Amino acid sequence: MTKPIVFSGAQPSGELTIGNYMGALRQWVNMQDDYHCIYCIVDQHAITVRQDAQKLRKATLDTLALYLACGIDPEKSTIFVQSHVPEHAQLGWALNCYTYFGELSRMTQFKDKSARYAENINAGLFDYPVLMAADILLYQTNLVPVGEDQKQHLELSRDIAQRFNALYGDIFKVPEPFIPKSGARVMSLLEPTKKMSKSDDNRNNVIGLLEDPKSVVKKIKRAVTDSDEPPVVRYDVQNKAGVSNLLDILSAVTGQSIPELEKQFEGKMYGHLKGEVADAVSGMLTELQERYHRFRNDEAFLQQVMKDGAEKASAHASRTLKAVYEAIGFVAKP
């Protein structure tokens, strides 16, 4: 029986955070045995915001080494760089012609990013969701792990696939969202009502996977809790967002349940909780960074992973693009 196909990716812009790891990368690792996993470093999406060329090249290799350090296995999964598989951009252009301006105008992420990068509101930023649809549909993807911020884009991918299929027959699989049974939603350390984001300008809000564990300890000890007297370590996202975030992080790192942790910290000060979180996270990062540096220092291996991954991805992508071009009426290349 063929395994269902899963597609996901991350941009090589900004350092990946513990939020990316606990909410996404760790789920990707766990899916490798039960699904045919295709994991992409989406460098073409990254250039919708201005990038320094040298930094982008470095960030791409850094991200690949992090994928591997987190446990993504090139023997089990297809791992590749988006720009190495030209079918992504080719299908993206074709799908533009089956996507309506009004649909893209309603994308909330475009509104957010165009407000943030007002000096560079480019067509690529507006068109980003169509390239994302191409990324997904190229591989006849069954399932896409998505967070809240990408649900709208996946819905558009489904709409485009259904519209194209209505015109030309069943060319595309219509992808479904994959909602993992467990996966921590890690919030900002100083503003715990918003998600931790690798693009946050205030770096005290964020814990990067490659940060010095000593600086991580300091950040966690400065994390927002609340002013309850006496302090109560209780999971209550509405009324105790900072404490709940620390409990979520500790639970994700140690595997202990929230009720177990509440019992463990009953009658204790917030400083005790922060100390435990700091020790657990810094220990996890120390081990992960050791694996990361081993991969990052072996550039020949990284080049081989990218080459093999692009070849595997292209074999699949070219079949879909050929079917699309035939359906549209393009003359086949002699």
Curated annotation (Swiss-Prot):
InterPro entries on file = aa-tRNA-synth_I_CS, aa-tRNA-synth_Ic, Rossmann-like_a/b/a_fold, Trp-tRNA-ligase, Trp-tRNA-ligase_bac-type, Trp-tRNA_synthetase
Query: What disulfide bonds does the UniProt entry report for this chain?
Result: none
Q: Which GO terms describe its biological process?
A: tryptophanyl-tRNA aminoacylation
This protein's UniProt keywords: Aminoacyl-tRNA synthetase, ATP-binding, Cytoplasm, Ligase, Nucleotide-binding, Protein biosynthesis
Q: Where does it live in the cell?
A: Cytoplasm
Top-level EC class, please? ligase
Query: Where is L-tryptophan bound in this sequence?
Result: 135
What is the residue range of the motif 'KMSKS' region?
Answer: 195-199
**What Gene3D superfamilies does the record tag this protein with?**
HUPs, Tyrosyl-Transfer RNA Synthetase
Q: Name one GO cellular component term.
A: cytosol
Q: Which GO terms describe its molecular function?
A: ATP binding; tryptophan-tRNA ligase activity
What CDD domains would the database entry show? TrpRS_core (cd00806)
Which reaction is catalysed here?
A: tRNA(Trp) + L-tryptophan + ATP = L-tryptophyl-tRNA(Trp) + AMP + diphosphate + H(+)
**EC number, as in UniProt:** 6.1.1.2
Report the family membership. Belongs to the class-I aminoacyl-tRNA synthetase family.
Name assigned to this protein: Tryptophan--tRNA ligase
- Please tell me the species this chain comes from: Escherichia coli O6:H1 (strain CFT073 / ATCC 700928 / UPEC)
